[in-house]
Each structure stands twice: as C-alpha cells, then as structure tokens.
C-alpha cells in the first residue's frame, strides 16, 4: 500500500471527516476565493486563470513550500491545452523566483504527476489541467510529497498568501531556483502503470479500443496496452491544443462505443483530458461507469483476500445498486461528499484500499494515491483475463437503480440554494419519493452549475421530479439555462 508520508513540517495530519454525509463534513470551501474541490479552475486568460495571477500563485506556493534551509523541488506537468504553455511559464517564473527548483515533465496524466512527485522525492507536484472541461478552460492542482492532493488547510494557506499584501522574503540571485526538463518521465510512468498489472498475465488476443480525448494520455495509454500484448485501436490521440475533450473521451463515449461495435472489440476504454477518470464499455457497447467498476473490483479483491476495510468508499452520488451489490456479499459502502479528495481522506482514515466516484475517478490505493484512469482500466482488463469471461457477463454483479442527473447553469458567485422556490421544490420531491428513492441537490465545486440527482424505481417519475427542481433553480437564478 502506498504510504502516507508527512506533507510539510507545519502540517501534522490530514483531517478526515468524522461522518459520511455532505452536510456534516467540514465546509472549508465556503471560505475560499480561488480553490475549489479540485484546485483552481476557470477560462484561460480570464480572472482568475490569468498569467499574472498564476505567477503570483507560483510565488505564494513557493513561499509556503519553502521551509528551512533545504532546497525544495516541485514537479510540473500539464495536459494538451494550448494555454498550458502560458501557465507553465508563469508558474516557473513564480516558483523559481522564490528559490524553488522545478522539474518539467510535459504532457502527462494527472496521476503520473502524483507518482513522479513521490518517485523523484519532490516536495510538491503541480498539474496544469481543467480535466474534462473544454480546451478554453484550464486549472492548477497541487500534490504533496506523498502524491496526494494537498489538504484543505494548506490550500487555504497558499490562498491567504496569494491574497495578502505582505512583502514576501525574496532569495538572493545566488539562491534562485532552476528549471529542468525530465526527458524520460513518460517512460517512467509507463513502467509504473504496468506494475499494477499481474506479472503472470498478458493481454494477447484482446482487442481494445482506447479513446484518449486528445488529452494527456494520448501517448502513454496506447503504449501500455500494446506493451502488455493487446491489439490496440486508438481514438482521440491527435491533440492540437484546442481539441481536448471535443466530442471525445469519457464525457462523449459515443465514438468509442461505435468503434467497439465496428471492429468487434472486446472492450472500450475512454479517458478524460487528464486521464484521472475512465469510462468503459463492454463488447456490446454498453457503458460501465465508476459504480459498476467499483462493484466488479471489490468482489474480485475480496475473492483474492486483498480488499481492506470490508467495503468500498464512494460518494453520495453513487447508485443505490452499488450499495445493494456490496451488501449481498457482506460488504459495506461508506459515502462521502462529492470529490475524490474526500473519498481518499476517508479511505486513509478508516483503512480502505478501494474507493471512487460514479464519474470514473477510481482510487486503487495499493497502486496510486489519486484517481488513475489507466490503472483502473488495467484492473478491469486483468479481471477479464483472469476470469476468461466477456465483460458484459462480469458487469452483471450490479443492477443499477434508475438515476437521473440534470445540471443547471447559474451565474458565477450566485447561490440559489436558499431560495424559497428551490427549497419548496426539493421538499415536494422528497415527499413524493418517500423511502423509495432519494434526491441530492448540490453546487458544483468546479463549474458554475447546480447538479440535481434523483433515484427511484420509476424513470419517468424521477425525471419529472428532477426537471421540477431544475425549473425552480432556473427561476431563482434569473433565467440561466440548462447546462
């Protein structure tokens, strides 16, 4: 199991949630100006994602990271967005001006940055990416020396320094940082990913369609699959700076499904722009989301005697069918608020080694410290190879309860959640569902949207309930439409 090392000397532990409901967990994000649930994110060249602010962010982070007389090192990676070059340069200027050495690794998946931060004994890792968002967005996310996302307290300290008017102590010219490019970073991650696959197995005879979303996995994912023996059919592996997530990848799996059916592949794999999440389809083209992958993986890990915590950690968004599938095998489902960082915190605090989100952020803690789309895909391929069964049959371990998810775009900074019309609509939906379903309404931590999720046995009924709540949110948000 990957060990949880100390992060910085002034931060002793990562605080874990005491309970598993989104309402009762620490609401640290309410006091934030820039950091959301997954770092800082926004449209490139528009506040806050401007080069001047990112330069200041680099200086603030460098000030916080610089503890004692030790020379500190930070890994910097990015996905394939055009604006990545601009933000990489801004971060380099800010960090090196504070005496921080920077190691640039180029376009690589987010989980590769987590791995390299540990492997190269760096003090921190930084990924420049907006994940599944369109190319015009970008973001900055931080990792500690243990390869885990920074705890809330440390992000808040960086933000405090960023917003303050204090004159930061600057190093003398002899003590400025240096920037160096690591040329073999891709090869290092390829070998690391392969170590998660059983040494006595190969993928010979398996035809795999892989959609890289024109993103960070465009080189590494096909290479890993090919080296393990698979026949690889690639999609979305020609990034041009503006086509990342553009009709391809985990948010748009239709092309993957179509290609699987055309070439009669055994499985389809689709990553998002930074490859920290994955969506898979079986040989018939049926989509398997993160909940199904968690169910399959949990049962296989239990069979092998390697599942810890007697269950799985997921979020309040996970389908009730996952909970039922696990319960049938004597396993529990622990739920956290939305965000893979909170899933990981609960896993660490309570001894679990498997967790994730319905969206495809899956954490196999024995292999990596963050959601890793490639390692998640390899775990499914290993299961297919071990069981010698088609994926459609393996996926039958879980029966989904009908679930509807709708999004409403709102004005940035607005909060319609306390509006009486919204409160009344939610109460009415809860009354109609009773004990036969559930409703969850929450603001996104990464986009100006409110997400409405309704579960129940009747698809038409829950769709109508979700639409009613969305209409109330639209009215409370002065006419902003559906997203």
Curated annotation (Swiss-Prot):
The modification Phosphoserine is found at residue 131. Its cofactor is Mg(2+). Its EC number is 5.4.2.10. Mg(2+) binds at residues 131, 272, 274, 276. SUPFAM superfamilies: Phosphoglucomutase, C-terminal domain, Phosphoglucomutase, first 3 domains. Activated by phosphorylation. The keyword Magnesium applies. Binds 1 Mg(2+) ion per subunit. Keywords: Isomerase, Magnesium, Metal-binding, Phosphoprotein. It catalyses: alpha-D-glucosamine 1-phosphate = D-glucosamine 6-phosphate. One of its GO terms (biological process) is carbohydrate metabolic process. The active site is at residue 131. GO terms for cellular component: cytosol. PROSITE patterns: PGM_PMM. One of its GO terms (molecular function) is phosphomannomutase activity. HAMAP family: GlmM_B. Catalyzes the conversion of glucosamine-6-phosphate to glucosamine-1-phosphate. Belongs to the phosphohexose mutase family. NCBIfam families: glmM, PRK10887.1. This is Phosphoglucosamine mutase. It comes from Magnetococcus marinus (strain ATCC BAA-1437 / JCM 17883 / MC-1). The gene is glmM.
